[in-house]
Amino acid sequence: MPIAKMKPVIWTIAINVLLMTSSTLAAEKSAVRFELHTNHIVINVGEQAFATYVFASDKITRPFFAHVHAPNAVQVTRNHPPQPDDSQDHATMHPGIWMAFGDISGHDFWRLKAPVVHHHFVVKPTTQPSGGTFTVENHYLATNSRQTVCVETCRYDILVRPTGYLLICSSKFTSNHDFYFGDQEEMGMAMRVATPLAVVNGGRILNSKAQRNGKEVWGKQADWADYSGTKEGTYVGMTLMADPNNFRHSWFHARDYGFIAANPFGVNAFTGGEKSKIHVKAGKSLRIRFGVLVHSNAKDKINHAANYRDFLNQLK
């Protein structure tokens, strides 16, 4: 009898060890890992590449994410720099995923005429149970690089979700003097998809109002817009989402050649209405937040509305 009673205990221990081992292996495979270099961070999920965050570059004078990969290891952003078989337009202005502004107090950070300088890490790259995070302080300098127009504190969260990799960008802009955000198409959070995903190569843009491709999506306000297509035999893409608590609902600047941006600033640019300025008083701040879901699910398996709700649930 004593021997018979011990057998279930032995099996229970063995099963618990197996469950713990499986759980540990799964956690390691989904763990966000950071490799900090002199001017960039290599971001991996487990042993697989996710993206490179470049915070200092001679040619691109603002931070950006390049070489962004979906969970199935297929790259979803255009090669940076563009390769011979890539479309060659906007080689420096469209490096992958970025936030930029064509007019802050008359200075153009989108077209690289005024620099954004990485000042320091407020929070160094840190792995968390649900993903990883880091926070940077960026200084937006005047065109002559002599004065600071404003200071951005930006938190990046990389979350491993059942539907893909979710990048959340939460920014706060402030200064010790007044400044303003102007009214242009080229403002906000943007991304350039891999060349095979562009609409002109068979890809598709779809927004939360079921409008499709550049002709219908451009200049329309929406909660999200997805840019997807087939690459290397699999369906991959990115969904650009705006926080509904931003100061204004975003319009989308969308192009069939592979570009899209979420822009809450462009009243005149997108509607033809009166040209707007978002003024920020000295000591006050403006906050904006966006998300990008990088996915590799089959086209008929994607529930964009559910993915957007999941994004909202992750906001802190």
Task: Please name every model-derived segment.
Residues 1-7:
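N-terminal secretory signal peptides that target proteins for export/translocation
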Residues 10-22:
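Bacterial N-terminal signal peptides
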Residues 27-91, 161, 244, 299, ...:
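Beta-strand-rich N-terminal accessory domains
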Residues 53-57, 64-68, 161-207:
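Acidic (Asp/Glu-rich), glycine- and aromatic
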Residues 91-163:
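Extended, loop-rich substrate-binding clefts of extracytoplasmic carbohydrate-active enzymes
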Residues 138-144, 156-160, 173-177, 193-197, ...:
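Beta-strand elements of well-folded, non-transmembrane domains
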Residues 181, 185-250:
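Active-site/ligand-binding surface loops and adjacent short beta/alpha elements
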Residues 241-316:
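Beta-strand-rich recognition/accessory modules
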